[in-house]
């Protein structure tokens, strides 16, 4: 089962084209300016089968056009990498473009496999400066930067996303 917080149909912000955005529950970061603070607790959300999510995506496929698809966001989707892998394989088999919006802070064999199945990774860099990153998120940015380097080395498509928040991440350097 996949622990889902909520859905957004016809999303236009989280990847190219029109997208079904699936917000997953749970995040190891504690960002001071979190856009989805209700997704942080791993105990929230609704247990949902991969089949239910697949059916929802397939039913909306006509609206995706050539550029759209499905985006998994959160929270932090890689916390549920093992449960997402079979779903990503089914989505690919159905010709649905997959984006994964991640902070890149988790790494293991399952996360690597999940990223390999993803068509486009949306990598959120919270702060490049290590000290400010820890202040903003409660975590180191070392793994996030290693994830960016891995994506680059693999030639895997990704977008770096940096949220500019006055007073938090709007430093001149």
State where each predicted segment sits.
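A short linear-motif detector with a strong N-terminal bias
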Residues: 1-3, 49-51, 99-102
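Canonical Radical SAM [4Fe-4S] cluster-binding loop centered on the CxxxCxxC motif
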Residues: 6-8, 12-48
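Conserved AdoMet/S-adenosylmethionine-binding subsite of the radical SAM
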Residues: 58-62, 66-69, 74, 78-173
């Amino acid at each position: 089962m996949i622990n889902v917080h909520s859905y957004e149909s016809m999303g236009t912000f989280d990847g190219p084209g029109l997208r079904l955005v699936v917000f997953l529950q749970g995040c190891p970061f504690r960002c001071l300016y979190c856009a989805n603070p209700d997704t942080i607790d791993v105990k929230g959300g609704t247990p949902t089968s991969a089949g239910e999510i697949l059916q929802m995506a397939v039913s909306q496929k006509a609206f995706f056009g050539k550029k759209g698809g499905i985006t998994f966001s959160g929270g932090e989707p890689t916390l549920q990498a093992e449960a997402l892998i079979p779903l990503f394989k089914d989505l690919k088999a159905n010709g649905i473009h997959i984006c994964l919006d991640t902070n890149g802070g988790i790494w293991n064999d399952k996360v690597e496999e999940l990223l390999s199945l993803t068509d486009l990774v949306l990598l959120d860099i919270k702060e490049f400066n290590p000290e400010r990153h820890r202040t903003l998120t409660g975590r180191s940015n070392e793994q996030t930067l290693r994830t960016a380097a891995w994506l680059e080395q693999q030639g895997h498509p990704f977008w770096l996303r940096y949220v500019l928040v006055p007073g938090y991440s709007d430093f001149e350097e």
